[in-house]
């Protein structure tokens, strides 16, 4: 059977990514990471992307209510090995425990930019003009 050459994640990568996301969320909710910056910040994990070999998990996080996202991301990456160790009980079925890497999730900012562009007067004028042409 030939391997797929597409860059889309496989069902297995998506399933494992969701399991890792849930496990990291539980570790953070229970307050197991003893770092004041992490303990005092609400952290939203929007997605975890797995490498094809399932050995690297990249977690996209958004620290809420904090101006300095980079400091929170740095603190999470500093404690990544500890967090990886705490994932073990919830991910027993995995042959290898993935290395966890944290990245800032910029997708919400991108959505806001697109929304503001769509609401701009120039774009709404063009959309109105297109609607008039169709009639």
From Swiss-Prot:
Q: Tell me where in or outside the cell this protein is found.
A: Cytoplasm
Query: Matching InterPro entries, A to Z?
Result: KH_dom-like_a/b, RbfA, RbfA_dom_sf, Ribosome-bd_factorA_CS
List, in alphabetical order, the Gene Ontology terms for molecular function in this entry. ribosomal small subunit binding
Q: Name one GO cellular component term.
A: cytosol
Single GO biological process annotation from the record: maturation of SSU-rRNA
For this protein, the record's Pfam families field holds:
RBFA (PF02033)
Subunit structure, as described in the record: Monomer. Binds 30S ribosomal subunits, but not 50S ribosomal subunits or 70S ribosomes.
Family, per entry: Belongs to the RbfA family.
Function, as annotated, reads: One of several proteins that assist in the late maturation steps of the functional core of the 30S ribosomal subunit. Associates with free 30S ribosomal subunits (but not with 30S subunits that are part of 70S ribosomes or polysomes). Required for efficient processing of 16S rRNA. May interact with the 5'-terminal helix region of 16S rRNA.
| Name of the protein this chain belongs to | Ribosome-binding factor A
Native source organism of the sequence: Rhizobium meliloti (strain 1021) (Ensifer meliloti)
Gene behind this protein: rbfA
């Amino acid at each position: 059977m030939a391997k797929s050459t597409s860059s889309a994640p496989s069902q297995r990568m998506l399933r494992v990514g969701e399991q890792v996301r849930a496990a990291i969320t539980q570790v953070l909710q229970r307050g197991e990471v003893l770092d004041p910056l992490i303990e005092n910040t609400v952290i939203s994990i929007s997605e975890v992307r797995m490498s094809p070999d399932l050995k690297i998990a990249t977690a996209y996080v958004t620290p809420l209510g904090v101006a300095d996202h980079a400091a929170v991301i740095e603190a999470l990456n500093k404690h990544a090995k500890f967090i990886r160790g705490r994932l073990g009980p919830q991910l027993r079925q995995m042959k290898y425990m993935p290395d966890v890497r944290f990245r800032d999730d910029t997708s919400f900012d991108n959505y806001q930019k697109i929304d503001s562009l769509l609401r701009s007067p120039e774009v709404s004028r063009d959309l109105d003009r297109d609607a008039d042409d169709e009639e």
